């Protein structure tokens, strides 16, 4: 009886914890794979640690993936303004990172939590934790923001709206799509803070 009741006791006694900025600080954010990731182990296990840019390429052939991402990008590029929600979050982010020049100047809006990068004064990332296929393929995805006048603390949930521009990120040694903020409003944490990729 004690053995069977232990999981129930633990489940009701310990609080539920969600991933947040503390997790980002502990794991770091890198592009496209986390630093120190053993790619040979990933290949043998079929898993990957993803940060900033969702990457679904390993789930399709190269031609199929290129076709899917191109269609996805075209669908959102045809919109005058893109509202990113829980259902399309990973799809839109992957399209933005795959075609940053085409999305430059595009207005987008989405909800995420704030992460203050100690290396970027007056710049904040807005992230969501996402799951691509299973928990082994999870990561933190979002955009660097600039121009916001309100500097929120880590883990503050915000609705951010602005236009995509491309800026060089010194630590990652590459150009990243960046959101030039038009509005940055504090919101309540969503009931489900995670986003998922539907295949």
What is each of the regions a protein language model found here?
Residues 1-199:
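OB-fold and OB-like single-stranded nucleic-acid-recognition modules
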């Amino acid at each position: 009886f004690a053995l069977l009741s232990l999981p129930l006791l633990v489940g009701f006694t310990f609080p539920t914890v969600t991933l947040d900025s503390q997790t980002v600080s502990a794991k770091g954010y890198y592009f496209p794979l986390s630093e120190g990731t053993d790619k040979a182990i990933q290949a043998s296990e079929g898993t990957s640690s993803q940060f900033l840019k969702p990457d679904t390429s390993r789930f399709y052939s190269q031609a199929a993936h290129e076709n899917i991402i191109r269609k996805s990008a075209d669908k959102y590029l045809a919109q005058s303004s893109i509202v990113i929600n829980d259902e399309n979050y990973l799809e839109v982010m992957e399209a933005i990172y795959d075609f940053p020049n085409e999305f430059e100047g595009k207005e987008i809006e989405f909800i995420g939590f704030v992460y203050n990068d100690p290396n970027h004064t007056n710049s904040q990332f807005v992230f969501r934790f996402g799951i691509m296929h299973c928990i082994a393929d999870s990561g933190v995805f979002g955009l660097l923001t600039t121009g916001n006048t309100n500097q929120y603390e880590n883990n503050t949930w915000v609705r951010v709206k602005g236009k995509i521009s491309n800026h060089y990120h010194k630590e990652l040694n590459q150009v990243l799509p960046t959101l030039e903020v038009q509005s940055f409003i504090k919101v309540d944490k969503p009931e489900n803070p995670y986003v998922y990729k539907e295949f």
